[in-house]
């Protein structure tokens, strides 16, 4: 009565519709749902509103609050509300107090799958997390579970499946609810004829990219994988893989593939790193050389420490999305630390094959290398270096470029019969893993282990020696600045005959051990903050002392650029006359 009298006093007076609403008793998703269903909430930002309109909206509060709580299992809430007329600032003030009451709990949960697909494991994932007896009733959880069953049926070819029973029974006397779901799967459909509309390669070549065969049980995920495989083939600018209308008579689904040919492409990239200085990449790609689907690529990479010119010819073999035979010709010049540099011309036939979660690369490198260091000055090698690589690939990998691997292992070697100055074998193992501790906290673990078997490291070409230090190794040290130290030969002054002693030079080591532990916290605006610990060394024996460093970093990740800034301080620096000061590590990688 008091509320009605209050409203009557302003019934004929228009008021600014700045309505302030206070809600007590509920929070989180329930509070948000209450606000979403409140008419007053939707009208509160109107420029002007009549008092009688406010009265009508106010009278809806009880029903709207009850409707908002029902999906969360609260069917009998107690709602207390009040309203104050416009104050000095002409604001309405509405207070709503909600006591949700006793929740409705699930009692019987009956889920049955009948029909020819009753025992098909494709429904296993959908059935893993059904609503549980004793849980508070949630309409959204019920709908999500029911939808998961229907999606599983549609995804895996049970296109005639239907819910013959779908009941949610609520007993307000006992505050119990029962769920009854019964799915009749019907027959599973199979892949029918596939029609392919493309002109890039021969028809039988493109069919090797299909992730299914005619007559296989229908699986929509294999259509998606086919789309990805054709996209990653580089033959096409656009690809559509479409399922047609299913045929109830034959229980088949026809498939159509439409693809438009890709043109020869250019790509460019620029960046900056503390290790590399300014860097740039230019690539020219011929996605299809002929109707057999052969590919050709020319790539140029330039930085202060490395210059690379690479020409590669790829021939798809086996499963063409995953396997290939390649011919690679490259010329490379690289600087290792301050004392060692290498020039390398190599021709490398290789065979790449993917076996489950592993990619294997077998190659034979025919190399002409020139190593320059202060010990032997200039050393020329002409040798053959066989190599085998095993690298992990993600689940459902389809040949796309990978910028990091959780595990990468390489074994190479050569003998004097193959041109090496001395027999050697070299093993390199790299691992990297990101563990999501929560939605905002991430743990990065990175390690590398290397070992070589050779009598004299100076007889090994420079590009096969181990160094440590730098942006992706041990921060707090400059690029490749951690290495065993050798003395250059003593010389005599030609004028005076005075003996000039040798100087220390970092020429690389037989073995390598490095590790990183980094914790990153996501921040607003695509930022992240990190703290890290790095350790390791490149040495000629594994019991050599290790270097350590700690630091902090800032990350910025945008669609067009990635920026990383780290400041690291060395804690231990074996082989250095004094402990280096703090070092800045900057890496800018625009995506062009």
Task: Spell out what each predicted region is.
Residues 232, 251, 372, 379, ...:
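C-terminal outer-membrane beta-barrel translocator/porin domains of Gram-negative envelope proteins
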Residues 17-29, 35, 42-277, 283, ...:
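Periplasmic polypeptide-binding modules associated with outer-membrane biogenesis and secretion
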Residues 116-122, 219-408, 435, 475-476, ...:
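Gram-negative/organellar outer-membrane beta-barrel architecture
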Residues 543-552, 556-558, 562:
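Strand-loop-strand
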Residues 96, 181, 537-541, 571-573:
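Short, solvent-exposed loop/turn segments at secondary-structure junctions
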């Amino acid at each position: 009565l008091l509320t009605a009298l209050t409203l009557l006093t302003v019934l004929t007076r228009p008021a600014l519709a700045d309505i302030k609403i206070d809600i007590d008793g509920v929070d989180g998703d329930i509070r948000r749902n209450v606000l979403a269903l409140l008419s007053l909430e939707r009208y509160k930002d109107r420029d002007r509103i009549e008092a009688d309109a406010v009265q009508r909206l106010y009278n809806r509060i009880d029903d709207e609050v009850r409707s908002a709580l029902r999906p969360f299992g609260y069917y009998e809430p107690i709602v207390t509300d009040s309203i104050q007329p416009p104050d000095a600032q002409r604001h309405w003030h509405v207070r709503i107090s909600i006591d949700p009451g006793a929740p409705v709990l699930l009692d019987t949960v009956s889920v049955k799958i009948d029909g020819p697909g009753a025992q098909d494991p494709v429904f296993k994932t959908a059935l893993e997390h059904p609503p549980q007896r004793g849980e508070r009733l949630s309409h959204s959880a019920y709908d999500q579970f029911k939808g998961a069953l229907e999606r599983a049926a549609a995804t895996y070819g049970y296109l005639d499946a239907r819910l013959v029973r779908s009941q949610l029974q609520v007993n307000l006397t006992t505050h119990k609810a029962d769920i009854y779901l019964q799915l009749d799967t019907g027959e599973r459909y199979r892949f029918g004829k596939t029609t392919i509309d493309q002109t890039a390669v021969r028809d039988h070549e493109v069919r090797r990219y299909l992730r299914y065969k005619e007559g296989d049980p229908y699986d929509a995920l294999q259509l998606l994988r086919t789309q990805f495989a054709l996209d990653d083939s580089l033959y096409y600018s656009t690809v559509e893989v479409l399922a047609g209308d299913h045929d109830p008579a034959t229980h088949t689904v026809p498939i159509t593939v439409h693809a438009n040919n890709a043109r020869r492409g250019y790509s460019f990239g620029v960046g900056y790193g503390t290790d590399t200085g300014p860097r740039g990449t230019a690539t020219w790609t011929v996605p299809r050389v002929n109707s057999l689907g052969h590919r050709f690529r020319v790539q140029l990479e330039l930085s202060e420490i490395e210059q690379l010119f690479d020409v590669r010819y790829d021939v798809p073999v086996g499963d063409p999305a995953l396997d290939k035979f390649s011919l690679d010709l490259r010329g490379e010049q690289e600087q290792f630390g301050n004392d060692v540099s290498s020039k390398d011309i190599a021709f490398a036939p290789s065979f790449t094959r993917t076996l489950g979660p592993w990619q294997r690369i077998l190659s034979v490198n025919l190399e002409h290398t020139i190593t320059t260091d202060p010990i032997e000055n200039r050393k020329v090698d002409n040798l053959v270096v066989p190599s085998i690589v095993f690298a992990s690939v993600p689940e459902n990998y389809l040949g796309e470029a990978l910028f990091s691997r959780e595990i990468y292992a390489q074994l190479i070697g050569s003998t004097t019969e193959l041109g090496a100055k001395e027999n050697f074998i070299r093993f390199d193992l790299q691992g990297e893993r990101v563990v999501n501790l929560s939605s905002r906290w991430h743990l990065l673990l990175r390690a590398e282990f290397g070992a070589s078997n050779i009598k004299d490291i100076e007889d090994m070409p420079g590009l096969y020696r181990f160094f440590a230090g730098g942006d992706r190794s041990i921060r707090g040290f400059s690029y490749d600045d951690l290495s065993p130290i050798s003395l250059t030969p003593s010389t005599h002054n030609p004028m005076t005959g005075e003996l000039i002693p040798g100087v220390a030079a970092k020429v690389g080591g037989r073995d390598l051990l490095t590790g990183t532990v980094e914790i990153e916290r996501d921040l607003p605006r695509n930022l992240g903050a990190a703290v890290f610990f790095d350790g390791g060394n490149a040495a000629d024996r594994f019991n050599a002392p290790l270097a350590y460093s700690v630091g902090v970093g800032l990350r910025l990740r945008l669609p067009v650029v990635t920026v990383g800034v780290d400041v690291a301080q060395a804690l231990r620096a074996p082989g250095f006359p004094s402990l280096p000061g703090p070092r800045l590590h900057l890496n800018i990688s625009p995506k062009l």
